[in-house]
Each structure stands twice: as C-alpha cells, then as structure tokens.
Curated annotation (Swiss-Prot):
Name used for this protein in its record: Transcriptional regulator Myc-1
Organism expressing this protein natively: Cyprinus carpio (Common carp)
Region feature Disordered, mapped onto this chain: 177-247, 283-318
Assembly and interaction partners: Efficient DNA binding requires dimerization with another bHLH protein. Binds DNA as a heterodimer with MAX.
Compartments where located: Nucleus
Keywords, sorted A to Z: Activator, DNA-binding, Glycoprotein, Nucleus, Transcription, Transcription regulation
Record-annotated bHLH domain positions: 310-362
Biased composition (Acidic residues): 205-226
MF (Gene Ontology): DNA binding; DNA-binding transcription factor activity, RNA polymerase II-specific; protein dimerization activity
Length: 394
C-alpha cells in the first residue's frame, strides 16, 4: 500500500485513528490555503472552482509492520511514486516542500495559463526520462536483486492506482533515485484512469506520449521474462514425462513375480501327504524352477526386486527341505531306540537323550563282548596246543 509503505519507515507506532478526516469540511483548512496563497500573490479567479477538488486520497489500510526501509529502498519507492503520478505529495515530502509545492506556478495557473504548466511538465518529463534510461542500464547488470524488488514495488503501484487524488496531474521535481523498477505492462497507467481535471491539453499530450514509450519498453522486458518462464515449464514437463516412463516395467515385473510365487505354494501339500516321495518331488520342482528362471532371463531383463524374490524363494524351498529331512531322521532314530520306539509323540530332546544312553550301553556291551571273545580265543589256543601234544605222544 503506498500510503502505509511511505509512512512505515517514519513511524511504526502511529495510531490508525490519528489520521485526519479525508474531506475538508472546516473553515480552518480553507483559511490555511488562503493564507498560503496570500503570501505570494492575490488569489486566482479559480480559487472557488479549485475548492471542489480539495480531496485527500482514499483512507489508508492498517499500519504496516514491515522492517525499516534502507536509503536505497526509500529512493526506489519515491521514484516509483513519481513514475505513477498517484501518491499525494503530503505523504512523501516534508512540510517545507509541501509549502513550496502549494506556491508552485502549476497550481496557481493550471486552470487558466496552460503555457507555463506545459513548459514545467516538459522539463519534469525530460528529467524523468534521463533517470529512467540510466536506471535501466544498471538494472541489466543486477537482474537478480531487481526481480526481488519488482514484486514488492508492483504491489505498491497496483494498490496506489486505487487512490484518487487531484494532485496526480501536477508532477513536481524531486531527487530521482539511481534505481527504478519495472511495473507489469498489463496494468493501465494511473494517469489514464483519472482524467486530468485542471491540466492543459499540451501537458496531458506530453504525458501520454511519455507513458506509451515506457509501456513499449516494459513490454519488451516482460516478453523476455515470459520466454524464460516458458523454457522452465518445458524443462519441468520433460522431467515429469521422463519420470513417468520408468516405473511401468517395474509394476509388470512385480505382477509376474507374484504369480510365480503362487506356483510355489502347491508343493508343501503333496510333501505332507506322501513323505516317501518327497525327495523326488523336490528334485522335480527344483528342476522346473531352474527352467523358469532360465526362460525369464532370456525373455526379460532381471531387476533387483526379482532377484531378491528368487533368492528368497530358493532359500525357503531349501529350508523346507532341510526341515523335512531332519524330521525324517528323527523318526528313524526313534524307531531304533527301544525305549521310545512305540512313542510317536516323543519330543526331539527325549529322543536325543535316549539315543545317547543307548549308545553308552551299547559301547559297554561291546567292550564286555570283546573281553569275552579274547578269553575264548586264548582258551581255544590252549586247547589246540594240548591236542597237538596228545597226537605227538601216540
């Protein structure tokens, strides 16, 4: 907002209610203008007509809470206000300059003598053109900082166009800043929106020509920016298209893996039904799995997900086979131990303990039998030797 933005860097804590009324109804204000004009020259014949246009701008919005503006930003704001001819002089100038502005020849003679006003306007416009061309050259070297300030100053100018001020047709000389930001060309200029109530025809013609030249230059700059934005959108679209092309084969491969997993689920039921032919069926299933894997390698490229699933399935098959073989070995061991041979519900720990005891007892029996065998062999040797002695004696 131009009013609040111009006041923000001066005082943050001013009250909203302290703003004066926006129409002059008192006689004190009329005396003030009358007194100011009386110091320089007699009142002009247009004084009564001019009283009808004594209006302040529309009321400002809430006080701004922005940070304090630097000197460069203040100069940018003043140059923007001068470029749009919208902001009232009392909000951007001090008290001394406001008095000199009231004494200006443009105000005194704007209704009747158009020659002096036209000369004054041409002088101001020529100075403003020179400053704008110098500022645009500096803007080309520092485009990044100007883009940040452009959005801020664009909001200021758009909200400024909503204010109605009779002083918009009276430009006044102020120190121009070294910078000037561009405004969107799609928005019409404020001077064209508010008709010049008290300016001469020559002054309005010069202002309109000046604004047309500025609009053409700003349109060229905006066209360059539009080209950049179109290229960025095309890059984003290309990246989006390239991202959307890749995940489709992964989904197809995952569906293929899920169907292949379903084929493995049929084998365990046959294993439990007929344990005698488990190894034969496991070998046949492993051969069929290897054939399926070879066919898939030939038809489609393997991905990391499919390889992990194949490894997982192979591990599950081998683990199931190992458990079945272990169970069969426990059953065979249980049948060999007399203590638990008839106990079908014997636990694996009980089977192992009984098997250990049975082994120890069998080892003792073996040693005892070996000692008996040795005794019998010696006895047989003695008997053979005695038999030979008896034969030799006869």
């Amino acid at each position: 907002m131009p009013v609040s933005a111009s006041l923000a860097y001066k005082n943050y804590d001013y009250d909203y209610d302290s703003i004066q009324p926006y129409f002059y109804f008192d006689n004190d204000d009329e005396d003030f203008y009358h007194h100011q004009q009386g110091q320089t020259q007699p009142p002009a014949p247009s004084e009564d007509i001019w009283k009808k246009f004594e209006l302040l701008p529309t009321p400002p919005l809430s006080p701004s809470r922005r940070q304090s503006l630097s000197t460069a930003e203040q100069l940018e704001m003043v140059s923007e206000f001068l470029g749009d001819d919208v902001v009232n002089q009392s909000f951007i100038c001090d008290a001394d300059y406001s008095q000199s502005f009231i004494k200006s020849i443009i105000i005194q003679d704007c209704m009747w003598s158009g020659f002096s006003a036209a000369a004054k306007l041409e002088k101001v416009v020529s100075e403003r053109l020179a400053s704008l061309h110098a500022a645009r050259k500096e803007l080309m070297s520092d485009s990044s900082s100007n883009r940040l300030n452009a959005s801020y100053l664009q909001d200021v100018s758009t909200s400024a166009s909503e204010c109605i001020d009779p002083s918009v047709v009276f430009p006044y000389p102020l120190p121009e800043s070294g910078k000037s930001s561009k405004v969107a060309p799609s928005e019409p200029m404020p001077v064209l929106d508010t008709p010049p109530n008290s300016s001469s025809s020559s002054g309005s013609d010069s202002e309109e020509e000046e604004e047309e030249e500025e609009e053409e230059e700003e349109e060229e700059e905006e066209e360059e920016i539009d080209v950049v934005t179109v290229e960025k959108r095309q890059k984003k679209n290309e990246t989006a298209v390239s991202d959307s092309r890749y995940p489709s084969p992964l989904v197809l491969k995952r569906c293929h893996v899920s169907t292949h997993q379903h084929n493995y689920a049929a084998h365990p039921s046959t294993r439990h039904d007929q344990p005698a032919v488990k190894r034969l069926r496991l070998e046949a299933s492993s051969n069929s799995n290897s054939r399926h894997v070879k066919q898939r390698k030939c038809t489609s490229p393997r991905t990391s997900d499919s390889e992990d699933n194949d490894k997982r399935r192979t591990h599950n098959v081998l683990e199931r086979q190992r458990r079945n073989e272990l169970k069969l070995s426990f059953f065979a061991l249980r049948d060999e131990i007399p203590d638990v041979a008839n106990n079908e519900k014997a636990a694996k720990v009980v089977i192992l303990k009984k098997a250990t005891e049975c082994i120890h007892s069998m080892q003792l029996d073996e040693q005892r039998l070996l000692s008996i065998k040795e005794q019998l062999r010696r006895k047989s040797e003695q008997l053979k030797h005695r038999l030979q002695l008896l034969r030799s004696s006869h």
